[in-house]
């Protein structure tokens, strides 16, 4: 075990901003409000956000997370996660007589609308993102015949388009800014007339958290990122920290996952968290470090954030009654249309 004292000059650099973004905050509150208004169970298609603690907490309150719409009983309420879903999922829910709440992050919805717009104009769309990620699946589903996935610079060589003068790039919102631009540069070299999206697709929170980590990584020997392994933006923070100069960087869900061996020879620890991580988990990491002599905490502030999103409009309706009416229509027990 590493021997430490409070006077050893050890310090913590705490990133700001960190943790919940506006889209995650909106989605989590939406589940809590739905449970409060309609009672359990509330079904959620896929994890509402990619964080183990958040999902487990909501499960205890009565949320049931499913991977397929077919797993939701007829007449139930189902919420779509912050990552967004393809149009076919909305169609499945309608066929299943489900009342739906769409908690898709508005910034993801923006990318969906861009995909539809460019598809309607018959562009080839090069979607920069990670294969299999829920957000990529949802966006691709908006225009599957027009979208080609580009999973990093290594994919560029094999990309083919119908007309090099009608090609546009879009991106997953949670990517590394630097890697995305590296991919874009490679695409522009191959397709000089490549069009950029009308506004930046990588979300403000992803960019701000990466900027703070870059500043931190210049001074930190070790960076601890609080986040789950299936969280794209959290994984990217580990990568950014290493590229910024940190000797080591690790991803943990909880403080008890930290290995004391990581602290050998370390005087400065950087701490941040992904956009789907509640602050309580960061506080537990800070307490863990404090108990081992890292009591001096300095804030590394990269940006101010004040963005908020309104809750899904469906939470202003009586969804239980709507779901029951849908089932009655199917069984023929509902009121006559005559």
Curated annotation (Swiss-Prot):
Matching entries from Pfam families are given as: LYTB
Enzyme Commission (EC) number: 1.17.7.4
UniProt record, GO biological process: dimethylallyl diphosphate biosynthetic process; isopentenyl diphosphate biosynthetic process, methylerythritol 4-phosphate pathway; terpenoid biosynthetic process
Q: Which residues of the sequence carry a binding annotation for dimethylallyl diphosphate? A: 50, 83, 133, 231-233, 276
Q: Which UniProt keywords apply?
A: 4Fe-4S, Iron, Iron-sulfur, Isoprene biosynthesis, Metal-binding, Oxidoreductase
**Does Oxidoreductase show up as a keyword for this record?**
yes
- Which annotated residues bind isopentenyl diphosphate? 50, 83, 133, 231-233, 276
User: Pathway of this protein?
Assistant: Isoprenoid biosynthesis; dimethylallyl diphosphate biosynthesis; dimethylallyl diphosphate from (2E)-4-hydroxy-3-methylbutenyl diphosphate: step 1/1; Isoprenoid biosynthesis; isopentenyl diphosphate biosynthesis via DXP pathway; isopentenyl diphosphate from 1-deoxy-D-xylulose 5-phosphate: step 6/6
Instruction: Explain how, and how many, cofactor molecules are bound.
Output: Binds 1 [4Fe-4S] cluster per subunit.
Q: Where is the active site?
A: 135 (proton donor)
Which residues does the annotation say bind (2E)-4-hydroxy-3-methylbut-2-enyl diphosphate? Answer: 50, 83, 133, 173, 231-233, 276
Q: Where does [4Fe-4S] cluster bind?
A: 21, 105, 203
In terms of CDD domains, this protein maps to: lytB_ispH (cd13944)
Q: Which GO terms describe its molecular function?
A: 4 iron, 4 sulfur cluster binding; 4-hydroxy-3-methylbut-2-enyl diphosphate reductase activity; metal ion binding
Q: Which InterPro entries would you find in this protein's record?
A: LytB/IspH
Which cofactor does the UniProt annotation name?
Answer: [4Fe-4S] cluster
Question: What highest taxon heads this organism's lineage?
Answer: Bacteria
Function of the protein: Catalyzes the conversion of 1-hydroxy-2-methyl-2-(E)-butenyl 4-diphosphate (HMBPP) into a mixture of isopentenyl diphosphate (IPP) and dimethylallyl diphosphate (DMAPP). Acts in the terminal step of the DOXP/MEP pathway for isoprenoid precursor biosynthesis.
Q: Which family does it belong to?
A: Belongs to the IspH family.
Q: What is this protein called?
A: 4-hydroxy-3-methylbut-2-enyl diphosphate reductase
Q: What is the lineage of its organism?
A: Bacteria, Bacillati, Actinomycetota, Actinomycetes, Kitasatosporales
The record's gene field reads ispH
């Amino acid at each position: 075990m590493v021997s430490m004292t409070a006077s050893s000059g050890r310090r913590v650099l705490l990133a700001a901003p960190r943790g919940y973004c506006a889209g995650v905050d909106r989605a989590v509150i939406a589940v809590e409000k739905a449970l409060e208004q309609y009672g359990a169970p509330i079904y959620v298609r896929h994890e509402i956000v990619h964080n183990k603690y958040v999902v487990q907490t909501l499960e205890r309150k009565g949320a049931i997370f499913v991977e397929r719409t077919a797993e939701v009983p007829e007449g139930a309420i189902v919420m779509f996660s912050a990552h967004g879903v393809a149009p076919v999922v909305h169609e499945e829910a309608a066929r299943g007589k489900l009342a739906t709440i769409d908690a898709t992050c508005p910034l993801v919805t923006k990318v969906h609308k861009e995909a539809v717009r460019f598809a309607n104009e018959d562009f080839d769309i090069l979607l920069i993102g990670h294969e299999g990620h829920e957000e990529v699946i949802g966006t691709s589903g908006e225009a599957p015949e027009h979208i080609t996935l580009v999973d990093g610079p290594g994919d560029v060589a094999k990309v083919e388009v119908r007309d090099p003068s009608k090609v546009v790039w879009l991106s997953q919102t949670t990517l590394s800014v630097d890697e995305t631009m590296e991919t874009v540069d490679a695409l522009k070299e191959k397709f000089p007339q490549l069009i950029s999206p009308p506004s930046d697709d990588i979300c403000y929170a992803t960019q701000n958290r990466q900027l703070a980590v870059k500043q931190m990584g210049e001074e930190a020997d070790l960076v601890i990122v609080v986040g789950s392994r299936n969280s794209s933006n959290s994984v990217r923070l580990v990568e950014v920290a290493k590229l910024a100069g940190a000797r080591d960087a690790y991803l943990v869900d909880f403080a008890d996952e930290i290995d004391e061996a990581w602290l050998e020879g370390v005087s400065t620890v950087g701490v941040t968290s992904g956009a789907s991580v509640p602050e309580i988990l960061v506080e537990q990491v800070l307490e863990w470090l404090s108990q081992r002599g890292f009591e001096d905490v300095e804030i590394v502030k990269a940006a101010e954030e004040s963005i908020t999103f309104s809750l899904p409009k469906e939470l202003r309706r009586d969804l239980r009654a709507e779901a029951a009416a849908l089932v009655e229509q199917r069984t023929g027990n509902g009121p006559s249309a005559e």
